[in-house]
């Protein structure tokens, strides 16, 4: 059943048809249904990889689970590295981010040492939906609701997420049908962590209120956001190419035809400020636009820079 399902997934077919099968990769293996599914997927496709398991020691059973994973990988003919996190790394006030930084640094180190060409992560559709909803509630820009990307780079090494379109229930049911045992990590339900609260409370509540699954609409929103971001970059590029630099002053012409397009004007200004190492808030961008639209000169401070707005031009000193 496992191989039959995976062979019928066209997005996976596209992914693996473009993967360089001559190279070797790293698989982040937690032992949960997601990463075990990915292990068997990579194995069934003939991908050469090394599994890396990070034991944070957060659960009493974690050491035994790490040993069981080693035995499973040995039985499957998959090389595995098990890393037990030192106690001093477990006391951070922000355990989620501290753990993430630790494992990414470890993955990077292993890739360099073993000459591996990418890191496989088993994030799935539900993880993606959680990311998008979190960004919506945090007030992210429309172009930044795109969630996790299928391929990004960390310190020059590709991060590969081929399961982003597959719901978690599909992964777990497929393993259940094949009688493949996996770990149920209780930290995934520990509501001290935001992700667990979203997973256990917010999503079920929203779906109960709406009477429908909200994962797919959030994935659609992420796709729309990705497309919007690409489109806006294309539209903004002709204007950004006209940035001028005189000594330490950057200037950008904002023609009337651009000012008539509010969204694009603010996007161009945002990218202009970003090129100078400045992240501008929505309020600041709106203020700049209001002065441009009304033809009113202004001088404002943004971080350690001075922003000057004149008729049809924005300058950064």
Curated annotation (Swiss-Prot):
<dbReference type="GO" id="GO:0006400">
    <property type="term" value="P:tRNA modification"/>
</dbReference>
<dbReference type="GO" id="GO:0005524">
    <property type="term" value="F:ATP binding"/>
</dbReference>
<keyword id="KW-0963">Cytoplasm</keyword>
<keyword id="KW-0436">Ligase</keyword>
<comment type="similarity">
    <text>Belongs to the tRNA(Ile)-lysidine synthase family.</text>
</comment>
<dbReference type="Pfam" id="PF01171">
    <property type="entry name" value="ATP_bind_3"/>
</dbReference>
<dbReference type="InterPro" id="IPR012094">
    <property type="entry name" value="tRNA_Ile_lys_synt"/>
</dbReference>
<dbReference type="InterPro" id="IPR012795">
    <property type="entry name" value="tRNA_Ile_lys_synt_N"/>
</dbReference>
<keyword id="KW-0547">Nucleotide-binding</keyword>
<keyword id="KW-0819">tRNA processing</keyword>
<protein>
    <recommendedName>
        <fullName>tRNA(Ile)-lysidine synthase</fullName>
        <ecNumber>6.3.4.19</ecNumber>
    </recommendedName>
</protein>
<dbReference type="GO" id="GO:0005737">
    <property type="term" value="C:cytoplasm"/>
</dbReference>
<dbReference type="GO" id="GO:0032267">
    <property type="term" value="F:tRNA(Ile)-lysidine synthase activity"/>
</dbReference>
<dbReference type="InterPro" id="IPR014729">
    <property type="entry name" value="Rossmann-like_a/b/a_fold"/>
</dbReference>
<keyword id="KW-0067">ATP-binding</keyword>
<dbReference type="InterPro" id="IPR011063">
    <property type="entry name" value="TilS/TtcA_N"/>
</dbReference>
<comment type="function">
    <text>Ligates lysine onto the cytidine present at position 34 of the AUA codon-specific tRNA(Ile) that contains the anticodon CAU, in an ATP-dependent manner. Cytidine is converted to lysidine, thus changing the amino acid specificity of the tRNA from methionine to isoleucine.</text>
</comment>
<feature type="binding site">
    <location>
        <begin position="30"/>
        <end position="35"/>
    </location>
    <ligand>
        <name>ATP</name>
    </ligand>
</feature>
